[in-house]
A protein has these predicted regions:
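Alpha/beta catalytic barrel-like cores
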Residues: 2-177
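Conserved catalytic palm subdomain of right-hand nucleotidyl-transferase polymerases, strongest
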Residues: 180
């Protein structure tokens, strides 16, 4: 039954309007063109980096609408419930890319804990996911992976990373939520 949604477009797209389907069709047609995709990514990165005011609305009405359920747990639940009617689970993914500040790692840890609380007892959200780089700098993982002697500040930094893992894993265990 679960795979039937991927084999039968009537099931897969039953909840979509003609307008939503046409929009998705043209978006995917554009994405399959490497030149358009590369130019689009470059333009998006440039406009985001330079704080162009209109970018947020364009992204929300295109990519975000197609690939995301919402900006908050509550907002996303409409999509989660709709998908679960067809036996498709959802995940709440929270990621901060390229940040290296301890406060950001702590905020990410707290956000993952909120995701765990929200997923608890909800079969429509079968697991919670996070990236290791949300808990610490890639460089500290590399140093630990090389098994080199860490400096005092690196040891303290690694201890904070480990503490974030322990907090999140313990909470997930206590609430019977799968982590990935």
């Amino acid at each position: 039954l679960i795979m039937s949604i991927f084999n039968n477009t009537q099931i897969a797209f039953a909840d979509k309007t003609d307008s939503q389907l046409k929009k998705a069709y043209w978006m995917f047609k554009a994405i399959e063109q490497p030149l358009i995709t590369n130019v689009g990514i470059s333009a998006l990165n440039f406009t985001v980096k330079n704080d162009f005011p209109f970018v947020t609305n364009i992204v929300k009405q295109t990519l975000f609408e197609q690939f995301c359920g919402g900006e908050t747990h509550e907002e996303s639940m409409k999509v989660v419930k709709q998908m679960f009617k067809h036996h498709v689970g959802s995940i709440f993914d929270y990621a901060i890319e390229g940040k290296a500040e301890e406060i950001v790692f702590d905020e990410t840890c707290e956000e993952i804990k909120q995701n765990i609380k929200f997923a608890e007892g909800n079969p429509a959200i079968p697991f919670v996911v996070f990236k290791p780089t949300g808990f610490g700098r890639i460089e500290i993982y590399e140093e630990v992976g090389k098994k080199v002697e860490l400096t005092t500040s690196q040891k303290e930094e690694w201890a904070r990373v480990v503490k974030r893992y322990e907090e999140v894993c313990q909470m997930a265990f206590d609430r019977n939520v799968v982590l990935m």
